[in-house]
Amino acid sequence: MKVLALRHSVAQVYADTQIYTHDETKDDYENAFLISNLTTHNILYLNYSVKTLQILNKSGIAAVEIQEMDELFTLIRCNFTYDYIDDIVYLHDYSYYTNNEIRTDQHWVTKTNIEDYLLPGWKLTYVGYNGNDTRGHYNFSFKCQNAATDDDAIIEYIYSNELDFQNFILKKIKERMTTSLPIARLSNRVFRDKLFKTLVSDHSRVVNVGPRNESMFTFLDHPSIKQFSNGPYLVKDTIKLKQERWLGKRLSQFDIGQYKNMLNVLTTLYQYYDMYHEKPIIYMVGSAPSYWIHDVRQYSNLKFETWDPLDTPYSDLHHKELFYISDVTKLKDNSILYVDIRTDRENTDWKAWRKIVEEQTINNLNIAYKYLSTGKAKVCCVKMTAMDLELPISAKLLHHPTTEIRSEFYLIMDIWDSKNIKRFIPKGVLYSYINNVITENVFIQQPFKLKTLRNEYVVALYALSNDFNNREDVIKLVNNQKNALITVRINNTFKDEPKVGFKDIYDWTFLPTDFETNESIITSYDGCLGMFGLSISLASKPTGNNHLFILSGTNKYFKLDQFANHMSISRRSHQIRFSESATSYSGYIFRDLSNNNFNLIGTNVENSVSGHVYNALIYYRYNYSFDLKRWIYLHATNKAGIEGGRYYEHAPIELIYACRSAKEFAKLQDDLTVLRYSNEIEDYINKVYSITYADDPNYFIGIKFKNIPYEYDVKVPHLTFGVLNISDSMVPDVVAILKKFKSELFRMDVTTSYTYMLSDEIYVANVSGVLSTYFKLYNAFYKEQITFGQSRMFIPHITLSFSNKKVVRIDSTRLNIDFIYLRKIKGDTVFDMTE
């Protein structure tokens, strides 16, 4: 949902939009809670409170102040990610298709012939890093830029088996127009940029597990971050390959040679970062014009020095000349060298050309060896061709996508590799590598071992759920890693499947109860965003591809009502109960009936079950930004930090009742996952709360009324307002609590409206209006370790007779309290009080 804050109402009506006017009788937190549970996508928030907007944004719900109608029109028609700290709106708006254009934030693409293969009459537009160049389109009171591009489709095309780009991009645009927007992917780059800038400033050592190409720009400015990936393809790994011949295959209609060069250099750069944790000088020989340097410059101040007879416009220092092996002495330490020398073939005879290529390959290799033979802190990437070669067994092979698969590949070596054992590799084996292997990632660092790192902050986004990881080892890492942000796939199945298929792999599934964490926040993507200064206009949907975000060691853990809080906890319930269910009271009715409380009068205002916990369990797929386990634990240990607002603390028994209702709901729905989750949450409640039951009571609290509107034959009809199991020495403690609650007890609006047979020969009158105070009293006794209440649900009633009587119904009648007392069962009254 998105909240657009206005000072005045607007005349225009928008689809899927609701108006909410700030309620001055309620505080900012309660207003935020009410807004978050509205069911429409767009909320126009009138007479807004800035504090309420802050609360929503911290909860991951995008809430933006609107000053002009243009701002309203722009934000209401598309989704966006909001940086609420720096007041920047990142639109995810594809309406630019109506201008017959596709967009890119990678400058190199604009220098290709891609426009020859677009839809008729279409053009390509460069919009800069995260759409930064579009800011001029929006003259708003907040910074605004459109981060939507088609780079995902362009890159997917490059790695696909499709050659016809026009058909491919047409298909992708149609998909985009007919399926739900994958907004988490769109906002992920904004999130990653913010995340790692924050972590690097707060932690001296940061580890990142499983980065992919979409992160290749994110880490350019963070050489200190240790990357773990799937490892490199080494020269020695070719021993598994059978010999093949030249294949020759076109991968792309438009020229992607620059993309290949960029990937080669970035792969080399991240190898250097992995070894030396600082930025090198980047030397490049050949590969002009290297327009992609402009893309790298958007993210980092890396320095480039280049050699090529052709211009390289974005180089810091360009030598418009050939580079010879004698020039290697000009290259400094603390650098990387990219050698991409190959003379254009033009009209040269094939055999003569092949001889030239092989000579240049040997020359390239000699340049690399000479560069690595002296000095320190050096990594080299060199262009090779398939031919009989001796190569270091530990050197890394690269074959990033290029326009046509021919005979070229690349080799990365560091100083140690260049001096390592060399092995003869036949030409046919290298052709086999070229024909069958595409390097899919610029990150080729070693795989991560699932072990706790003592002094590092570990980030593992979408990297650990794969079933080639041991599930118990993943759980152990989450439990024991002190500082971390780790994601795992949430169990969205209804049959409690331990793993699910995704693309061509299988992932383990998890629930929050799979983890034993006391100082970790377990939330959703949008809940996590709120903790890093971001919010989003479209909440996560239960697609089956959803992840739990687990933050360990965060200073926000105790800020219970600010982050990963209960905002939107009833939203799914509202959507169902007002559109699909038998009555809007269905949730209240079901919760009472499933706990054998059959008095449904006023059930919507006097419910005996925690609606928060019930909704968090049965609709966990729709709102898992609310960290239920943390909420339970912090209340149980009395450590919950509440910033403000009228905050109701549930008695532990209300939480137990909610689990019981959720379990019955799950059985009716045949939802085995909710059934397990509810059982495990109930076990967790019993673990963190020291709940004792007065199932063998020796004292009770009684309430005598001045008026009973029914006939009775018991001596003193009264309401048993709870039973206790205490020693006589604890009586003063009980009395002290009763005195503390005196005012609230006598203010209860107690009513009755019918009689019924509680069981055979026990004739009683119903009592309404006391449950809220009962649970508050329960909490007060619990905190003083006084055993109060039984394991079965408290159903308030007044016993009228120990015989069978006819049921009577009357108009709701107020019962006036005469006095309240504490009495020993089968004993004397030890305390009483009147108003």
Curated annotation (Swiss-Prot):
Residues 693-835 are annotated as: 2'-5'-phosphodiesterase activity. GO terms for molecular function: GTP binding; hydrolase activity; mRNA 5'-cap (guanine-N7-)-methyltransferase activity; mRNA guanylyltransferase activity; RNA binding. Its EC number is 3.1.4.-, 2.7.7.50, 2.1.1.56. The active site is at residues 718, 720, 797, 799. InterPro entries: VP3_Rotav. It catalyses: a 5'-end diphospho-ribonucleoside in mRNA + GTP + H(+) = a 5'-end (5'-triphosphoguanosine)-ribonucleoside in mRNA + diphosphate; a 5'-end (5'-triphosphoguanosine)-ribonucleoside in mRNA + S-adenosyl-L-methionine = a 5'-end (N(7)-methyl 5'-triphosphoguanosine)-ribonucleoside in mRNA + S-adenosyl-L-homocysteine; 5'-triphosphoadenylyl-(2'->5')-adenylyl-(2'->5')-adenosine + 2 H2O = 2 AMP + ATP + 2 H(+). HAMAP family: Rota_VP3, Rota_VP3_A. Belongs to the rotavirus VP3 family. This is Protein VP3. It comes from Rotavirus A (strain RVA/Cow/United States/WC3/1981/G6P7[5]) (RV-A).
